A protein has these predicted regions:
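Loop-to-transmembrane alpha-helix initiation sites
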Residues: 127-132, 146-154, 166-178
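Interfacial segments of multi-pass membrane proteins
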Residues: 49-52, 75-78, 112-143, 157-165
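C-terminal ends of transmembrane helices
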Residues: 23-26, 95-107, 135-144, 186-193
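Short, non-helical or kinked segments that cap or interrupt transmembrane helices
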Residues: 34-42, 103-116, 144-154
């Protein structure tokens, strides 16, 4: 098979798998509700965690990660695809599919968990180190709502760490392409400004 045809096939395959939104399926199955009508309306693991149940949120996040991790592993183990770019196209395709899912009118989630699935395949050691640091920073120092900051720190730190590990250049490029795509999907949350609640001014009665 022509190299570029292989890349296209892997990208499309990853995209079709990534287009399955487990947040939609699990929420409907467990509570018979539409995840888009709950919380912030985002069809992602964190919204399921907060509005459907912690267990179901964690399960959703794991399944979203599996969308990238398992197809990449299967492609390597059973289809003997060793080309780093081809494997990366599966992961990138899954990330794009989660953000612009074919089966849900191209309205998807933020794809952080799916990207972390790709990271688990390519840069597993860096991901584990970043996870440990992330937990310490979030719960030891910041002590704020997990929200967007947990995944953002994890993704950024994993990407930075991979630059200092002996990976081939293609892996590092794919890791950062995935990070930039996910950053694009999260652009509204990262630039969001919280409204300040005006303080009540007490007036002395004359």
């Amino acid at each position: 098979m022509n190299q570029y045809v292989l890349y296209l096939v892997c990208l499309v395959a990853g995209y079709l798998i990534g287009s399955v939104l487990f947040a939609e399926l699990i929420t409907k199955l467990v509570s018979n509700q539409n995840i888009r009508e709950l919380g912030n309306g985002n069809p992602g693991a964190y919204n399921v965690f907060r509005n459907v149940g912690k267990f179901w949120g964690v399960l959703t996040g794991l399944l979203d990660a599996v969308k990238a991790l398992v197809p990449m592993w299967i492609a390597y183990q059973f289809f003997h695809i060793t080309d780093t770019t081809a494997l990366g196209c599966i992961g990138i395709g899954a990330v794009i599919g989660h953000g612009y899912p074919l089966y849900y009118h191209f309205k998807g989630g933020r794809a952080a968990s799916t990207l972390l699935g790709m990271y688990a395949y390519f840069i597993g050691i860096e991901l584990l180190i970043a996870l440990a640091v992330d937990v310490i920073v979030l719960f030891g120092f910041i002590k704020k709502e997990y929200g967007i900051w947990g995944p953002s720190i994890l993704i950024a730190l994993s990407g930075i760490l991979c630059l200092f590990f002996p990976h081939e250049l293609g892996v590092k490029i794919l890791v950062w392409i995935g990070a930039l795509i996910t950053l694009f999907f999260n652009r509204d949350k990262l630039t969001e400004k919280k409204e300040k609640v005006p303080k009540k001014v007490s007036r002395q009665q004359s």
